Regions:
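Structural signal for conserved beta-strand scaffold positions within catalytic alpha/beta enzyme cores
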Residues: 41, 95, 121, 141-146, ...
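Extended catalytic core of nucleotide-activated donor transferases of GT-like folds
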Residues: 6-137, 151-156
Length: 258
């Protein structure tokens, strides 16, 4: 009898050219650190091959980008239909959600419906609010939004000398819609504020919240290594939107008032 497990990993990172290294490391943690097993890693941005449904899996992992399908009712309905075999599977199921404050009630119903065995998530002090039903079980485990990989540790053993770095201060973030509250708003404006306050100081800056300036893959690590200082802010949201009602209202408003 083989000791190898058949494991299905579901993510939705889309085009590999746009993957962010830290997200990829979370989604691929099992193939990277337990490569002795048999894996099917499926990008849910692509159609699901029919043969996948015929495999008897020992484990199924629902990655954070796959669970983002909860944000859009039509996408969620399509996901629940197309991946109904996951619900019926006897495999041990693990979910790794992020941004739990966004559509948390929808997410909890989904995880309960699919009989997920373990949920690795953040904010343990708020589990009773985010997951009132799951919190009453032994399902929740502390997880993190990112991890330091072995390859990253090895890379930083000899970082670029401080004096050789060509960027004095850098920053990248997205300007988030209002449904993320004050925390989301501050994350989107601190770069602009810093630029305004230091315009005549002679710093070499690389600060942007423009989507076209997103840095993908390992190029992000190069960017960090070439920066002397990086601006930072709290991540997440200052609003809890369990049913996605705030998100829907904001999206609707912005259509007419961009």
């Amino acid at each position: 009898m083989s000791d190898k497990l058949n494991i299905l990993i579901l993510h939705r990172m889309g085009d590999p050219k746009t993957w962010r290294a830290s997200v990829r490391d979370v989604e691929f943690c099992l193939p990277d650190y337990a490569p002795e097993h048999n894996y099917i890693v499926h990008n849910a941005a692509m159609p699901l091959p029919s043969f996948v449904k015929d495999i008897e899996f020992h484990g199924i992992v629902l990655g954070p980008t796959f669970l983002c399908n909860r944000y859009h009712p039509r996408m969620l309905a399509k996901t629940l239909k197309e991946y109904a075999f996951v619900k019926e599977s006897r495999a041990f199921k693990i979910a790794m959600p992020q941004d739990d404050y966004d559509c948390s009630a929808i997410l909890e119903r989904w995880l309960l419906d699919w009989d997920v065995d373990l949920v690795y998530t953040v904010c343990p002090e708020h589990w009773d609010v985010l997951y009132p039903n799951l919190a009453a079980t032994d399902t929740l485990r502390l997880g993190y939004t990112g991890y330091v990989s072995d390859s990253m540790i090895e890379r930083w053993r000899r970082p670029k000398p401080f004096a050789s770095r060509t960027i004095d201060v850098s920053y990248r973030a997205s300007k988030l819609p209002p449904n993320f509250g004050t925390i989301g708003y501050v994350k989107g404006i601190i770069g602009d504020i810093f630029l305004e306050k230091t315009i005549n100081e002679g710093f070499r800056l690389d600060i942007s919240t423009n989507q076209k300036d997103i840095i993908h893959g390992d190029r992000w690590l190069d960017f960090v290594e070439n920066s002397k200082f990086i601006l930072g802010s709290n991540s997440g949201s200052s609003l809890l939107d369990p049913e996605g009602e705030i998100r829907f209202a904001v999206d609707k408003y912005l259509v007419y008032h961009p």
